[in-house]
């Protein structure tokens, strides 16, 4: 997978095992294994920088642990948290959960919402989360139509509104879920502009990897109704 990723032009990878109660999630062990793999990549001259995080499932136990130890689950311990919602439905009180996570210094990144049937049927439900500072990550395979037509349509609707902050491979193997980004990057650049594609695939991911604030963003569409709110967004993203 590392060779595939490097050949596709990927330079940084966040390794994200599931933190869902089904698999054992031990950050110290994950860090140890990633360090071993990083040394192997250097020996093999594969130019790939590895980081750690997780697919954070919204169980009661996870939420409480994240509130007491925010760095445990976030990307490289810096505060950006990849939040995975269920395949079907949404957890009750999700808006409040995002708020609780933000109150301890975490920045939630909602992963692959375009693949959730509830959100496919009710995309405006995401508006309040976005207004409150939740970020959005879409899967490259969805953009390319590899995750079904509904996911493809929603991915492009989100992109058209500039509601997306990250593209990711969500890679699991080298066949059906390979670490490939180039095709999606080129399609986004063609349809929505090269500046936006670079934000989603280079600038924003690198900022999250390093734990830095995101660079100035392209103003989202259809998110704020009056000019005062739009000006507030502009001020926020230019800090």
Language model features with spans:
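Non-catalytic positions within long, well-ordered alpha-helices that form the structural scaffold/packing
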Residues: 6, 102, 159-160
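Short beta-strand segments at enzyme active-site cores
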Residues: 11-17, 51-53
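Short acidic/histidine-rich active-site segments
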Residues: 16-18, 163-179
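Active-site environment of divalent metal-dependent phosphoester hydrolases
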Residues: 20-23, 57-59, 115-119, 143-146, ...
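Extended substrate/RNA-proximal surfaces in nucleic-acid metabolism proteins
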Residues: 25-137, 220-239
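Histidine/acidic-residue-rich catalytic or RNA/ligand-binding cores of hydrolases
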Residues: 27, 120-127, 147-156, 160-161, ...
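Conserved short secondary-structure transition element at the edge of the structured enzyme core
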Residues: 138-140, 155-169
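Mid-to-C-terminal alpha-helical segments outside catalytic/metal-binding sites
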Residues: 186-239
């Amino acid at each position: 997978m590392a060779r595939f990723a490097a050949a596709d032009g990927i330079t940084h990878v966040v390794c994200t095992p599931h933190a869902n109660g089904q698999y054992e999630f031990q950050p110290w062990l994950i860090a140890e294994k990633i360090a071993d793999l990083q040394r192997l990549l250097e020996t093999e001259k594969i130019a790939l920088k590895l980081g750690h995080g997780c697919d954070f499932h919204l169980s009661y136990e996870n939420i409480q642990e994240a509130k007491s130890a925010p760095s445990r689950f976030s990307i490289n311990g810096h505060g950006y948290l990849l939040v995975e919602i269920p395949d079907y439905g949404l957890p009750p009180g999700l808006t409040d959960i995002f708020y609780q996570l933000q109150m301890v210094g975490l920045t939630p990144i909602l992963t692959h919402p375009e693949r959730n049937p509830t959100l496919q049927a009710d995309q405006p439900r995401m508006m309040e989360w976005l207004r409150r500072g939740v970020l959005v990550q879409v899967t490259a395979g969805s953009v390319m139509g590899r995750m079904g037509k509904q996911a493809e349509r929603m991915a492009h609707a989100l992109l058209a509104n500039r509601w997306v902050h990250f593209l990711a491979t969500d890679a699991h193997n080298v066949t059906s879920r390979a670490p490939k980004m180039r095709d999606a990057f080129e399609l986004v650049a063609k349809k929505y502009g090269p500046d936006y594609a670079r934000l989603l695939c280079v600038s924003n991911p690198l900022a999250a990897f390093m734990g830095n604030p995101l660079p100035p963003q392209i103003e989202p569409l259809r998110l704020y109704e009056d000019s005062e709110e739009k000006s507030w967004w502009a001020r926020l993203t230019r800090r």
